[in-house]
A protein has these predicted regions:
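Non-catalytic positions within long, well-ordered alpha-helices that form the structural scaffold/packing
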Residues: 94, 161, 169-170, 199, ...
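Conserved beta-strand scaffold positions in the cores of enzyme catalytic domains, especially
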Residues: 17-21, 134, 364
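Divalent metal-coordination and catalytic microenvironments
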Residues: 24, 35, 48, 97, ...
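Di-metal (Zn2+ and/or Mg2+/Mn2+) metal-binding site signature of metallo-dependent hydrolases
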Residues: 25-47
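Histidine-rich, glycine-flanked metal-binding segment
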Residues: 1-27
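Flexible glycine-/small-residue-enriched beta->alpha junction loops
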Residues: 43-69
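Metal-coordinating catalytic core of metallo-dependent amide/deamination hydrolases
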Residues: 68-85, 91, 99-215
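Active-site-adjacent C-terminal substructures of enzyme catalytic domains
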Residues: 204-205, 213-332, 344-350, 356-358, ...
Length: 373
């Protein structure tokens, strides 16, 4: 972006510039989806019925479902298969006004399969006019084969630290490392070790933090200077204060809690009132948030998190960029920023969160190149 101003001023300054008629629509910065799990094989629609019958997320996981189901499926697929499945998903994401997308690995949980997932993300970046931000999530779960003798969880953690992270860093396959810090998954101490190794290898860090139970993960994110702490539906008051006193962005995922049928959403207003920076994201994944519709997440941010439309828009642009370490590059319509734009067929910004479930995106651009039209 070289200039922002009134039509008359810009027409005088740039008389030969190519013009695009927005036909009275609303132009926003391209939406920044800072938390997705777009590299997977089959959907997990059967789990929705299991939850409706009364099973919890952790009970389904304990039966070999959840993340473990996606792991079995991804391991059986080739890189080419995963690429072919992910490509139309990312195009659908762009069709809803998103121009920057964080994409995680995490359904491999083995060296070759995690590398395979990250290489798919690299191929997707070459094939799509979007900005993809790759994240290594080898610590998404403890794989089933390390939950019983002769193998142990400590051996898997050693594999992540000693083999996965060095390979990911050496091949420059990821910008971030992430971990699921949650009771029953990774402890705070285990998370500190793994994230410390990732940082030492040159990766920035993120956390899945305090999603289902307060575990001190938000406090750990603040302690380590993580770029973001995500989920936070069960964050403690102490965790809120810790994030508010830090530079870590609190990324909230209201679509996940809605789809899981959980009444308790992240305490967005308390986080804002304490001074934390709030981002929102889709958490697009096959089990707990199968949506690419970012404007729907804005609707949920307003109706469920009690954000204003202005706050939700900020959370999906400026703060979404900050949650990816891109605050100086994208998320704003200002000189010097990348020309990442989304055009919506609405007459008022407040309509962006009003027509819930309806896609009003007419076109989107990343760095001036069309993502969707």
């Amino acid at each position: 972006i070289v200039a922002v101003g009134t039509q008359s001023t810009l027409e005088l300054a740039y008389p030969t510039a190519h013009r695009i008629d927005c036909d009275g629509g609303v132009l926003t910065p391209g939406l920044v989806d800072s938390h997705t799990h777009a590299i997977f094989g089959k959907p997990r629609f059967e789990e929705q019925e299991l939850r409706a019958s009364g099973l919890t997320y952790m009970e389904i996981a304990a039966q070999g479902g959840g993340i473990h189901s996606s792991v079995r499926d991804l391991r059986a697929r080739s890189e080419d298969e995963l690429f072919a499945l992910a490509l139309p998903r990312l195009r659908r994401i762009a069709a809803h006004g998103t121009t920057t997308v964080e994409v995680k690995s995490g359904y491999g949980l083995a060296l070759d399969d995690e590398l395979k997932s990250l290489r798919v993300i690299r191929r997707l970046q070459s094939a799509l006019p979007m900005r993809l931000v790759p994240t290594f999530l080898g610590a998404h779960e403890i794989p089933l084969e390390y939950r019983a003798a002769p193998r142990t969880r400590d051996e898997y953690i050693a594999l992540v630290i000693d083999e996965m992270i060095p390979r990911v860093a050496a091949e420059q396959l990821a910008r971030f490392a992430d971990i699921f810090c949650e009771p029953g998954v990774y402890t705070v101490d285990e998370s500190r070790r793994i994230l410390g190794a990732a940082r030492a290898a040159g990766l920035a860090i993120k956390l899945h933090a305090d999603e289902l139970e307060p575990a001190g993960a938000a406090e750990l994110a603040a302690e380590l200077g993580a770029t973001s702490a995500d989920h936070l539906a069960a964050i403690s008051d102490h965790g809120i204060r810790a994030l508010a006193a830090s530079e870590t962005v609190a990324t909230l995922l209201p679509g996940t809690m809605l789809f899981l049928g959980r009444a308790k959403q992240a305490p967005a207003r308390a986080l804002i009132e304490q001074g934390a920076a709030i981002a929102i994201a889709t958490d697009f994944n096959p089990g707990t948030s199968p949506t690419v519709n970012f404007p729907l997440i804005l609707t949920l941010a307003v109706s469920q998190l009690r954000l204003s439309v202005a706050e939700a828009t900020l959370a999906s642009t400026v703060n979404g960029a900050a949650a990816l370490g891109l605050a100086a590059e994208t998320g704003q319509l200002a000189p010097g920023f990348s020309a990442d734009l989304a055009l919506f067929e609405i007459g008022d910004l407040r309509e962006l969160a009003y027509w819930y479930g309806d896609n009003r995106c007419k076109a989107s651009w990343m760095a001036g190149n069309a993502c969707h039209s």
